[in-house]
Design a protein with these regions (language model features):
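Mobile, glycine-rich extracellular loop/lid and propeptide segments
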Residues: 2-5, 70, 87-90, 95-98
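Acidic-basic catalytic patches of nuclease active cores, encompassing PD-(D/E)XK
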Residues: 4-77, 81-85
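Acidic, metal/cofactor-coordinating or nucleic-acid-engaging core segments within structured domains
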Residues: 41-47, 51-56, 108-110, 120-337
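Short, well-ordered loop/turn elements at secondary-structure boundaries
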Residues: 88-89, 109-111
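Conserved catalytic cores of phosphodiester-cleaving nucleases, focusing on short active-site segments
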Residues: 92, 114-120
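Short loop/turn segments at secondary-structure transitions that flank enzyme active sites
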Residues: 95-100, 121-125
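Short loop/turn motifs that connect adjacent beta-strands in outer-membrane beta-barrel proteins
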Residues: 102-107
């Protein structure tokens, strides 16, 4: 079931995100993501904010919160049926699990996920009014930015590849089939490439401003509001009915990790989890010993220029070997234990 959180939680999350960046903005999306998910970053702060919202333990009942961060070493890629060139699935993902258990049963009340595409606003107009796809405002046809937007805004059928060097897809013909558009499955998150000045400051109520995956939509949802809407399965605060929910539920059982099935949104979520290091997954759900992910102080990025053959593919493999483009996966689990 969704968490029951007050609207003020969003402001508390945004306040802590500002503290992570020490109220200084500017830098590439990968560098800014590294700051967000550093050892003293969002993970610990989110746990401190959410833990007090759990129901106090009573005789025969308790609630526990576990938050983990996993880094997928090389980002998975999608190859749309309508496009011969692969595209990275996203820069980050958030998962939420709600587990009920007692002496006789273990039942997953809810499993939910959202994929996030991070972009650094560089153009003057984007610094003042960031809008999807952020950088650039109008991408070249067949560019990586154009392909990212096509994937997250349409979710046409695609083949999923484990990494850029993978010759064969992990899953063929994945069909997410969102019921409405813009889809709830994937959102954009924007951060300023350079420090906002003057009137530009008003656009950045949070270091990360978010929007659904639809061309031209303003990034006017703070990351705190996005996380709140995701965890509560509700509309974004002040977003109105025009915005979709953040994320979509999926069917989950730990046995699916060893025996995946299907080719829909459920399968895509399971495949992302399968790529996560086992010891980074919530121990309460997966039984693995959870560890702390260490983020490199400097993450370098080169644009995706690959194709299905020749120099582009070789370049991708070389780039990923030297500067692996990792995908951050934030996992939030609530366990409700009776008895």
């Amino acid at each position: 079931m969704p968490l029951r959180l007050e609207p003020e939680i969003a402001a508390a999350i945004d306040s802590q995100i500002w503290e992570i960046y020490r109220h200084r903005l500017g830098g590439s999306e990968l560098r800014q993501l590294a700051k967000l998910f550093k050892r003293s970053g969002l993970l610990t702060r989110l746990e401190n904010i959410l833990s007090p919202t759990l129901r106090p333990p009573s005789r025969g009942y308790r609630e526990d919160l576990e938050i983990r961060l996993a880094w997928i070493d090389k980002r998975p890629l999608a190859k749309l049926e309508t496009n011969p060139r692969r595209v990275e699935l996203g820069d980050a993902a958030i998962f939420f699990f709600d587990l009920f258990q007692n002496a006789k049963t273990k039942r997953y009340l809810q499993s939910r996920a959202v994929i996030l595409q991070a972009k650094a606003a560089k153009e003057k107009k984007q610094l003042a009014r960031p809008a999807v796809p952020v950088n650039p405002t109008i991408p070249r046809a067949m560019s990586s930015t154009a392909r990212e937007l096509e994937l997250l805004s349409t979710w046409r059928k695609f083949d999923l590849y484990k990494a850029s060097g993978s010759r064969a897809p992990t899953v063929r013909g994945i069909s997410v089939a969102p019921p409405r558009f813009p889809p709830a499955n994937g959102w954009y998150m924007a951060t300023p490439k350079s420090r906002p000045r003057g009137a530009e400051i008003h656009a950045w109520k949070s270091p990360w401003m978010c929007a659904p995956a639809a061309s031209g939509l303003l990034c006017n949802v703070t990351l705190g509001n996005l996380i709140l809407a995701f965890l509560t399965s509700s509309m974004v605060n002040g977003g109105g009915s025009s915005l979709p929910e953040v994320g979509t539920n999926f069917k989950f059982d730990p046995q699916y990790l060893s025996m995946p099935r299907g080719n829909d949104w459920d399968r895509l979520c399971i495949e992302i989890l399968r790529l996560c290091p086992r010891n980074r997954l919530p121990q309460s759900l997966f039984g693995a010993r959870a560890g702390v992910a260490v983020v490199a102080s400097v993450l370098r990025s080169l644009p995706y220029i690959g194709s299905e053959d020749g120099l582009g593919d070789w370049f991708l493999r070389f780039r990923d070997f030297i500067w692996p483009r990792r995908m951050a996966v934030l996992l939030i689990a609530v366990t409700r234990t009776e008895g």
